[in-house]
Amino acid sequence: MNSMFCSELQQALPQMSEDVAVTAQTILNGTPPHNHFRKEWLAGAAGTTTPTTTSGGQMMTLSPPAGDGPGSAGSMAPESTSSLSDLSGDAEGVWSIDIDQAFQEALAIYPPCGRRKIIISDEGKMYGRNELIARYIKLRCGKTRTRKQVSSHIQVLARKKLRDEQAKKKGDIPSLLQQASPPGGVKSPSAVVFPPVSAAVAAITEISPQSSYSSIVPKVETDQISQQLFKSLPLWSFQQTPGLPIGMDLSQLVFQQSSPDKTVSPVKSEVVEETKPIASSQLTLHSFSAYVKCNKTSLRTELVKIENTLEKDDIDISVFYEKYPKLLRELFEKSEKKDVFFLAKCWANINVSDDVQNCQYAVDSFYSSREKFQLKVSTMACSFGNQAVEKIEQYFPIEFDGSYSFILNNSPMCDYMVKFIAELKKLNVIETMNNVLENFTVLQIVTNSETDELLMVLCFVFEVSQEPEPSCSVYRLIDGGGDSDE
């Protein structure tokens, strides 16, 4: 690159300090069709929070993500329109030739620097590498790419490179979606070794109100829900392999105990194989099921299902921090009990009726404890690490044979989730659905309603199942010494 262009770049950088952003109000007032929103997320959305509404024991809050943080300076109407046209229509991992060329040039100019910042001498300000690349693309092509889109594009290219390398070694490797498999097929060798933990805690829920309460959800159209969930890109640098969650290779994160040589018959090995319950010293999750029941035929279709089995692998919680609100990290760092944090990777079955009006979307869940208390369950749907909606439910104990059960059957799923599922189905292509689900998570926090003692925290990630039945793998989240901050 000649010196003249470098000089032009340095002069223009100070003028590009504001990322193009769109406020939540703008998004809700006018959203593109569902087939466009995959690439129309914008960082730095100036979030507006709707007032919290309460009724009985249930609370629902709809609050758009806070955006890109201090680096964003709000939205400018002329650039917002330009940005939408700039960012729409790109396939996953595919940018136009001019943008990709500028992207490659910027990669060469700005070498990887980890979480460190690069100082622009003329400005005296510090910038992350991805932000500088985004600014360079804007200067070079006049088209907007946010720093998070740059981060995502880098990761997409890295995953493609990995798949190409694997294909050369192993031949034709089926795609991620073709090998999405039940929990038994998720196990893989370890690249990061953590000591196994004997006891485990977990819990799971969908966004679902208690059956005795009415659902309180703001009136939001389906396209608005889609746009609500896609305003920015996550910061990930993990590689994708078949059948593993949220575009990540869990084999890079988990420890799997080496199993002895199988010298016994399959029947005997099944008998001696030890399974771990999803439980802690205070609370046990026995089962969870989110389902759709047709009122006309009484046919019940399971969307998500968890059984009382914990995987033997442990995963570093820090790699998931940016998938969830900051509350997750705060809870983990402050909690004296580190055994109450879990990840549930769910392969969901969305082959359900499109007749939403004549179908019941509901949740069944069953917990137990040897202690008597009331459970408070806070469940948040999150998009790109930011809370979108929250629901709070109450579970009351039922004493039986010296223990206490917490049962909630036929609890209606909230309108937000019903509309999200309907909108997701419109994408038709499973791979596209999974790309969407990479940025959608659910966080459940279970506490003692009287003392606020933390009992369980479960982080949900989702993928569309290729099988007719849903499945799930639950892992313990531990402190692996990592840090996902940029």
Curated annotation (Swiss-Prot):
Its main location: nucleus. This is Transcription enhancer factor-like protein egl-44. Pfam families: TEA, YBD. Residues 47-87, 165-188 are annotated as: Disordered. It is found in: Nucleus. One of its GO terms (biological process) is negative regulation of transcription by RNA polymerase II. Transcription factor. Binds to DNA sequence motif 5'-CATNNNNAAATGCAT-3' as a heterodimer with egl-46. Represses expression of genes involved in differentiation of touch receptor neurons (TRN), probably acting as a heterodimer with egl-46, perhaps by occupying similar cis-regulatory elements as an unc-86/mec-3 heterodimer. Plays a role in cell fate specification of neurons, including the hook neuron HOB, and touch receptor neurons. One of its GO terms (cellular component) is RNA polymerase II transcription regulator complex. Residues 47-57 have a biased composition (Low complexity). PROSITE patterns: TEA_1, TEA_2. GO terms for molecular function: DNA-binding transcription factor activity, RNA polymerase II-specific; RNA polymerase II cis-regulatory region sequence-specific DNA binding; RNA polymerase II-specific DNA-binding transcription factor binding; transcription coactivator binding. Interacts (via N-terminus) with egl-46 (via C-terminus); the interaction is direct; the interaction may regulate transcription. Interacts with yap-1 (via WW domain); the interaction may regulate transcription.
